[in-house]
Swiss-Prot record:
<dbReference type="GO" id="GO:0004017">
    <property type="term" value="F:adenylate kinase activity"/>
</dbReference>
<dbReference type="GO" id="GO:0004550">
    <property type="term" value="F:nucleoside diphosphate kinase activity"/>
</dbReference>
<keyword id="KW-0808">Transferase</keyword>
<feature type="binding site">
    <location>
        <position position="392"/>
    </location>
    <ligand>
        <name>ATP 2</name>
    </ligand>
</feature>
<feature type="binding site">
    <location>
        <begin position="325"/>
        <end position="327"/>
    </location>
    <ligand>
        <name>AMP 2</name>
    </ligand>
</feature>
<keyword id="KW-0963">Cytoplasm</keyword>
<dbReference type="InterPro" id="IPR036193">
    <property type="entry name" value="ADK_active_lid_dom_sf"/>
</dbReference>
<feature type="region of interest" description="LID 2">
    <location>
        <begin position="391"/>
        <end position="424"/>
    </location>
</feature>
<protein>
    <recommendedName>
        <fullName>Adenylate kinase 8</fullName>
        <ecNumber>2.7.4.3</ecNumber>
        <ecNumber>2.7.4.6</ecNumber>
    </recommendedName>
</protein>
<feature type="region of interest" description="Adenylate kinase 1">
    <location>
        <begin position="58"/>
        <end position="258"/>
    </location>
</feature>
<dbReference type="GO" id="GO:0004127">
    <property type="term" value="F:(d)CMP kinase activity"/>
</dbReference>
<dbReference type="InterPro" id="IPR027417">
    <property type="entry name" value="P-loop_NTPase"/>
</dbReference>
<keyword id="KW-0067">ATP-binding</keyword>
<dbReference type="Pfam" id="PF00406">
    <property type="entry name" value="ADK"/>
</dbReference>
<comment type="function">
    <text>Nucleoside monophosphate (NMP) kinase that catalyzes the reversible transfer of the terminal phosphate group between nucleoside triphosphates and monophosphates. Has highest activity toward AMP, and weaker activity toward dAMP, CMP and dCMP. Also displays broad nucleoside diphosphate kinase activity.</text>
</comment>
<feature type="region of interest" description="NMP 2">
    <location>
        <begin position="298"/>
        <end position="327"/>
    </location>
</feature>
<feature type="binding site">
    <location>
        <begin position="354"/>
        <end position="357"/>
    </location>
    <ligand>
        <name>AMP 2</name>
    </ligand>
</feature>
């Protein structure tokens, strides 16, 4: 056959490698930085860029009205992510021609010109600490004009957090604000008093503490710009209610910044569905396949289909199926490898259930380069599983399934001809459940990023839970170093 006419085969390891190393996002980042920075020597620029310790660093903007807790959240955020905390006041402390020029405007109580303002931001963000570790901009920008200036300069955040609270709460917070002169940490006489008595004794009332009238004016000015800022950053913005304990506020902020933004990178679903008998794997796999056009592969049905086609592999499988014995893992893997290597699975993705049954089979699947990017465990109790299956029966005339509790037969005539599956007897189910649970703990350890779904719900509710974790990217996991330091 002419090589040009051969069917296209994309090795599965190519796709897995690209996803594992986030190649598509890397290329996008390289092109974006090239277009923004416009270096004279693009090749050397790319080499230097790729030699950095961390290409994908945090880029976060934290906005909110006065007294909303921006400083506290920003400092905690930087402790967790190792990013650099930046305020405009900190930028002005740098000794440079630009900062001295900006300070002269402040001394005259004049606004800093936009060109000078953006140069100051660019100068700070281009320093090695920000380049290597990322940054958190607190209260920058303050207006839509400033936000647009940042965009024109190529300063685009991955996440924007806007804190909100009622004005009454903010005014009360402002009046009770206290500062630790040693660390600069912000406390409050009512809402956030330090646990350490030593810290409490040295707290000071801020020299910039605003009277109620001035605070009200600042809030009004903030609100006039807030709506425009929301529109500017709508695609990466999260609004968080700041009128709650600061621990809860920070938890929500951290959860948001650990959630990657939607990526335009190609995404081919490779899904494993685990669950005990009666959990609804077949139904959920069917729903996923129907909605997203991916290939539904039930291992048991696939083996039956191969055994019926009178091929050499079918002749190997048939004796095991006829004697109701488990087909050896090596044979199952050969069948699955052939099926998962076809173009429809490579191009559209797949949802597999019924395999692997244990960690040894999971390792074989992994070594064959068919690594899933989503793993779900459907969870129900043994009592629910037995109730769902032991009370099911099929009408041999119509093929319709009935359940004595949830879907009783329409009349005595249908009731009389119903047939129960011998494998759904309580004794058989208990044996299958025992076998499933004996392997589950090790399988869960083998797939630490697996998602657990409560399957004791309406099937469409279960599907919505699956879907929410299927279409979105999985949250980032902080490194051990970052976790230990906090």
């Amino acid at each position: 056959m002419d090589s040009a006419e051969r069917p296209l085969r994309i090795p599965p390891e190519m796709v897995i490698y690209a996803e594992k190393h986030d190649i598509f996002h890397l290329i996008q980042t390289l092109v974006r930085n090239l277009m923004v920075d416009k270096p004279d020597d693009p090749i050397q620029y790319l080499i230097n860029f790729l030699e950095r310790d961390n290409v994908d660093v945090p880029r976060i903007i934290l906005l909110g009205p006065p007294a909303s807790g921006k400083k506290t959240v920003a400092k905690k955020l930087c402790e967790h992510t190792q990013a650099i905390h930046i305020t405009f006041c900190d930028i002005l402390k740098d000794d440079s021609d630009l900062t001295r020029a900006a300070q002269s405007y402040y001394d005259k109580k004049q606004n800093v010109p936009k060109d000078l303002w953006i140069q100051l931001i660019q100068q700070r963000l281009s320093k090695p600490d920000c380049v290597q570790r990322g940054w958190v901009l607190e209260a920058i920008p303050k207006t839509q004009d400033e936000a647009l200036c940042l965009q024109e300069a190529g300063i685009t955040p991955d996440h924007v957090v806007m804190l909100e609270a009622p004005d009454v709460v903010l005014i009360e917070r402002s009046s009770g604000k206290r500062i630790d002169p040693v660390t600069g940490d912000v406390y409050h006489v009512t809402f956030m008093w330090p646990e350490s008595e030593e810290v409490a004794q040295r707290l000071e009332t801020p020299r910039t503490l605003m009277p109620v009238q001035v605070m009200s004016q600042k809030l009004q000015k903030y609100h006039t710009e807030a709506h425009a800022l929301k529109r500017t950053y709508h695609n990466c913005l999260k609004i968080i209610n700041a009128d709650q304990p600061h621990v809860d506020v920070f938890s929500q902020v951290l959860n948001f910044i650990c959630t990657p933004r939607h990526s335009p990178s190609p995404y081919t679903p490779r899904i494993l569905l685990f669950g005990p008998p009666g959990a609804g794997r077949n139904l959920q796999a069917k729903l996923i396949a129907q909605k997203y056009g991916i290939i539904n592969i039930c291992c048991g049905e696939l083996l039956k289909a191969v055994s019926a086609d009178e091929s050499h592999m079918g002749e190997l499988i048939k004796p095991y199926l006829e004697s109701e014995q488990q087909v050896p893992s090596s044979i199952v893997l050969r069948v699955l490898t052939e099926r998962l290597s076809r173009m429809d699975c490579t191009a559209r993705g797949w949802v597999l259930h019924g395999f692997p049954r244990d960690v040894e089979e999971a390792e074989l699947l992994h070594k064959s380069n068919f690594t899933p990017n989503r793993v779900f465990f459907l969870e129900i109790t043994d009592d629910i599983a037995i109730e769902r299956l032991a009370l099911r029966a099929v009408d041999p005339v119509t093929g319709e399934w009935y359940h004595s509790v949830y879907k009783p037969p329409p009349g005595p005539e249908v009731q009389a001809r119903l047939r129960f599956n011998p494998q759904h007897s309580e004794a058989q189910l208990l044996m299958r459940l025992k076998e499933y649970w004996s392997q589950t703990v090790r399988l869960q350890a083998f797939y630490p990023q697996a998602v657990y779904i409560n399957a004791d719900q309406d099937p469409h509710t279960v599907f919505e839970s699956l879907e929410s974790r299927l279409v979105g990217q999985l949250p980032k996991v902080l490194s051990n170093q970052q976790t230990n330091e906090n």
